[in-house]
Regions:
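Conserved functional hotspots at enzyme active or ligand-binding sites that engage polyanionic ligands
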Residues: 1-114
Length: 114
């Protein structure tokens, strides 16, 4: 399990407005940190046209490399740490350009100054 990989995981149980159910996520945590069996992930959801106006949503076009079947969006606002026990199967991985866009969304959402 490495940064930029897309995995199908179970996010339930959830509370309130947390994104739920079994869905794809992208691993956003660094491969160089962490000794616990945890990964930091950002969930993917079906693409909707109005997401183009939301700065923390990154569009992802399905292709063979990423293993997605439909246009999706990475929701950086819903980033979270999850146990590797939630991971079901690897779908694919993202290209460097898409990963950079997701990283920039995380910088904005988390208020990190570069």
């Amino acid at each position: 399990m490495q940064r930029s990989e897309i995995w199908l995981i179970s996010l339930d149980p959830t509370i309130g407005a947390e994104i739920r159910k079994t869905r794809p996520v992208v691993i956003v945590s660094s491969d160089d940190v962490g000794t616990l069996p945890l990964k930091i992930v950002a969930p993917l959801t079906d693409w909707k046209l109005h997401y183009a106006e939301i700065p923390w949503m990154t569009a992802i076009v399905p292709n063979r490399q990423n293993g997605l079947e439909k246009p999706s969006s990475c929701d950086a606002f819903q980033v979270r740490s999850v146990s590797v026990e939630r991971f079901i199967r690897k779908l694919g991985s993202l290209d460097a350009k898409t990963m950079q866009a997701i990283t920039q969304s995380l910088v904005e959402v988390l208020g990190i100054e570069e």
